[in-house]
Amino acid sequence: MTLWVVKIGTSLLRGETATTIDGYARCFAGAMDRGDQVVLVTSGAVGLGCQKLALTNRPDTVVALQAAAAIGQGALMGLYERAMARHGRSVAQVLLTRSDLADRRRYQNASGTLRQLLSWGVLPVINENDALSPAELRFGDNDTLSALVAAAVEAQQLILLTDVDRLYSSDPRVDANAEPISDIRHPRELDSLEQGAGDGGRWGTGGMTTKLAAARIATASGITVQLADGRDPARLEALLQGQRGGTVFHPHPEPLGNRRSWLAHVLRPEGELQLDAGACAALQHRGASLLLVGVTAVRGDFAANQPIQLLDPDGEDLGRGLCSMDSDQLRAAMNDPSPGESSPVVVHRDGLVLRSR
């Protein structure tokens, strides 16, 4: 049994949306009939709302986008519900915000709810709660959301469907020398690609940049990611039957566990700690906890047990951790002229996750 998370982008849900969704539904039902489980993360609520309002351009204000999403979400779910019903399957709408996943208990509740739906043979249809989410609580794109959902349910496979056939070394629409890429085997290979990735289209929010970020999140959690052309549902059917297609992002050989994945990718840092070289070496090579003596600078205001970003001496991202002190306590301890015999723990190794190198 394979647990699949499939993300369908806005660019695939234009025009004859009902016909397109019918094709995807056949693929999902076929996989479920074979004993697999499928979670769908779908875009399209804003685009469908704009179609219903006969808008020629995507709204450019948050309020208008949220209103369009409110109109389109019900219609979108209706299309999926009717399409899956033709195959004797039910769907369940799950709308999420970042705050739903940032709280550890709610994160576990969301994971448990999705697992229960899957055990009943239901297709969970997930979207961001666009109609209500303020900017600071938004994922911003469904590529990221799909990777976080895949990690939460401990999926084996994440499929990112888009309107290009695979990843390229540069944008093939403007660069005739762009080279197709079939495999990405290490996070380092993503670095240069992320720098050259483009923005989203007129209707969507996720360009190739967000897909690469999603692949980084999922592969760090031990999930295989496939980026493929979803314009023909037959290609999705082939992927769900185990065939390769598009670009395959291979999982990290030492994946994060569920809690560390949550810490690394769901929580937003409330501040920064810059470390000296000795502390960096202790964290990276000896699996140590971060001690106060290794902290050279504190930035931001945060409470105890909130997530903070760790930076090396050059200001490069080292990882994230849950800080045992609030920012005022930490600054006071650093400035204490008579520290105790032992340096206190600032971030325990159990609440620490380092960036993949």
Swiss-Prot record:
GO terms for molecular function: ATP binding; glutamate 5-kinase activity; RNA binding. Pathway: Amino-acid biosynthesis; L-proline biosynthesis; L-glutamate 5-semialdehyde from L-glutamate: step 1/2. InterPro entries: AceGlu_kinase-like_sf, Asp/Glu/Uridylate_kinase, G5K_ProB, Glu/AcGlu_kinase, Glu_5kinase, Glu_5kinase/COase_Synthase, Glutamate_5-kinase_CS, PUA. Keywords: Amino-acid biosynthesis, ATP-binding, Cytoplasm, Kinase, Nucleotide-binding, Proline biosynthesis, Transferase. It is found in: Cytoplasm. It is an enzyme of class 2 (transferase). Pfam families: AA_kinase, PUA. Residues 270-353 form the PUA domain. GO terms for cellular component: cytosol. SMART domains: PUA. Gene3D superfamilies: Acetylglutamate kinase-like, PUA domain. Substrate binds at residues 43, 130, 142. One of its GO terms (biological process) is L-proline biosynthetic process. CDD domains: AAK_G5K_ProB (cd04242), PUA_G5K (cd21157). It catalyses: L-glutamate + ATP = L-glutamyl 5-phosphate + ADP. ATP binds at residues 7, 162-163, 205-211. Its EC number is 2.7.2.11. Belongs to the glutamate 5-kinase family. HAMAP family: ProB. PANTHER family: GLUTAMATE 5-KINASE. Catalyzes the transfer of a phosphate group to glutamate to form L-glutamate 5-phosphate. This is Glutamate 5-kinase. The lineage of its organism: Bacteria, Bacillati, Cyanobacteriota, Cyanophyceae, Synechococcales. The gene is proB.
